[in-house]
Amino acid sequence: MTHTCVLTWLAEKYTMYLNMRKGVGFMEAISREDALALLKKYNKDPFHLQHAFTVEAVMKWFAKEMGYGDDADYWGIVGLLHDIDFELYPTEHCVKAPELLREGGVGEDIIHAVVSHGYGITIGNGTTLDTKPEHTMEKVLFAVDELTGLIGAAALMRPSKSTKDMELKSLKKKYKSKGFAAGCSREVIERGAEQLGWELDKLLTLTLQAMAATEDELRREIEN
């Protein structure tokens, strides 16, 4: 890490420590088992559940990759719950989520992270979401949410149906095709890379690596 990255990492760790002292931190709020039960309370569609599991696994991978390994489960919980309101309340996405999460005993830090992944997006009821990603974890969530969907769709087009043998050039070709996985916003993905201070290629490369590395784990989760 550079000196600036180290200072940022220390500041974020200290903020999370203070939050936990206040009783709003993840470890005091909800377990993975309870988070999964809460997710399934509001989500039944296998596609939505698979997306939640995918983002959970990718978030945990990024936590470890970026030096936040001790917080990998925390990052994963955020990924698991990020779309909790989408299935039942699609026109209130990220607006209804705080209510559902608070009822489930989820801490305000996770709620902020979940809501922030919709930053700048105008949802079905005409509201433009204005909760900005602040923590590195929140910026990663914003960046990978749409991208995991695009990579997953690209994998399904391959004979192997896998990300493990997918090369970056193949992904970039699909990415540049506006008609492919059109529902996965390239604008949001590119804003996500910008918020992280990364080139788009870096985000594509790392997210592809994350999905390939966690593919077997994800398959086991879906089969359970």
Where are these predicted regions, by residue range?
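Divalent-cation-assisted or electrostatically stabilized phosphate/pyrophosphate-binding catalytic cores
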Residues: 163-205
